[in-house]
């Protein structure tokens, strides 16, 4: 049997570790960019973010407190996915990793820093805002880069233009992103997550307003997931019952019928089913911007899902039912 050389095995392990980390970042969806002048406040900030539903942070090396802050968070919040940002030198890489950082983020493309991280298997997301930097990142074996400064560099429109020639490249835009434009960036499926500091503002940290940080984090998560009622499903035991009910709804409200293989939609908001779908009385479909991401955040709240009900299209999860019924109705997520 032919076995791969050790260097290829080692490289494979590094790539797998990087992919696993980026997959988790993608599920979290938001990477708070934290600037700390006082390392003693680091744990309180991290716990506030976790309380708000974000278990990830990028602590920047813009201050002398960064290394100690990372160390404090890594020790007290082991479930936090912790990165080091604004890393400019290989010495800072060593300091960050020694303190407990799990990934490195740089503002620009520094070949020395990138190659150093790649050689040591340290996940890195380098800043790139043009094709030259992107091609250097690809040559280094990376498939995810930071688009920075996102808004100043042209926003989503520029991001889509950059992504065009690089079909396998993904982005983590940062810079000028806030609660109002977050959804626009995340709607572009080449974006794995967005970085931002709006939920960890300087004044909130200085005033020890950790409840305020938690609230802004929670609001950001809800904006990102964008939950909304899509339709209500009515259970029946036969296609005849389905046809009769759909016809009656059309007679009363004028909602045109849209027939499918197992149900009829009487408008977009009412699904009349010709068989017993999950739910004693029926089901309620909750739309979301990203099913995988929504599952991740809801599972952290203890919500259980029926894995057998998963539906995919082109590799993306489109829908899945919760195990729990509420008021005799099943609930399922649907990606919209």
Identify the residue ranges that each predicted region occupies.
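Conserved N-terminal beta1-alpha1 strand-loop-helix module at the mouth
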Residues: 14-99, 119, 179, 207-222
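N-terminal beta-strand motif that seeds the catalytic metal site of vicinal oxygen chelate
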Residues: 21-35, 221-246, 279-286
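Catalytic beta/alpha-barrel core
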Residues: 33-35, 56-63, 80-88, 101-109, ...
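Glycine-enriched alpha-helix->loop->beta-strand junction motifs that scaffold or abut catalytic
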Residues: 50-55, 76-79, 98-104, 119-125, ...
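Catalytic cores of alpha/beta
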Residues: 89-99, 132-140, 177-192
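Glycine-rich phosphate-binding active-site loops on the catalytic face of alpha/beta enzymes
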Residues: 107-113, 146-155, 190-212
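Amphipathic alpha-helical segments
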Residues: 239-253, 296-302
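Vicinal oxygen chelate
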Residues: 269-274, 299-336
């Amino acid at each position: 049997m032919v076995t791969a050389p050790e260097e290829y095995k080692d490289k494979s392990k590094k790539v797998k570790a990087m992919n696993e980390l980026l997959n988790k970042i993608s599920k979290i969806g938001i990477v708070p960019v934290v600037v700390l002048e006082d390392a003693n406040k680091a744990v309180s900030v991290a716990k506030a973010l976790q309380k708000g539903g974000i278990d990830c942070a990028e602590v920047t090396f813009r201050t002398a407190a960064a290394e100690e802050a990372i160390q404090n968070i890594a020790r007290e919040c082991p479930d936090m996915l912790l990165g080091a940002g604004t890393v400019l030198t290989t010495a800072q890489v060593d300091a960050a990793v020694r303190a407990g950082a799990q990934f490195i983020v740089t503002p620009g493309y520094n070949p020395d820093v990138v190659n150093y991280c790649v050689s040591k298997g340290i996940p890195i997301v380098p800043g790139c805002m043009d094709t030259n930097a992107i091609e250097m990142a690809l040559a280094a074996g990376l498939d995810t880069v930071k688009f920075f400064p996102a808004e100043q560099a042209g926003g989503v429109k520029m991001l889509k233009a950059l992504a065009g020639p690089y079909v396998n490249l993904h982005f983590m835009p940062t810079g000028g992103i806030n609660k109002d434009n977050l959804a626009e960036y995340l709607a572009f499926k080449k974006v794995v997550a967005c970085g931002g500091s709006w939920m960890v503002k300087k004044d909130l940290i200085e005033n020890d307003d950790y409840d305020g940080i938690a609230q802004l984090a929670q609001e950001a998560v809800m904006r990102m997931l964008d939950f909304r009622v899509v339709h209500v499903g009515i259970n029946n035991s036969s296609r005849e019952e389905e046809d009769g009910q759909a016809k009656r709804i059309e007679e009363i409200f004028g909602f045109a019928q849209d027939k499918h293989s197992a149900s009829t939609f009487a408008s977009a908001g009412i699904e009349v089913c010709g068989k017993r779908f999950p739910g004693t009385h029926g089901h309620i479909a909750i739309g979301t911007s990203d099913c995988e991401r929504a599952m991740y955040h809801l599972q952290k709240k203890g919500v259980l899902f029926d894995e057998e009900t998963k539906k995919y299209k082109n590799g993306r999860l489109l829908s899945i039912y919760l195990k729990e019924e509420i008021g005799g109705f099943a609930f399922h997520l649907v990606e919209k």
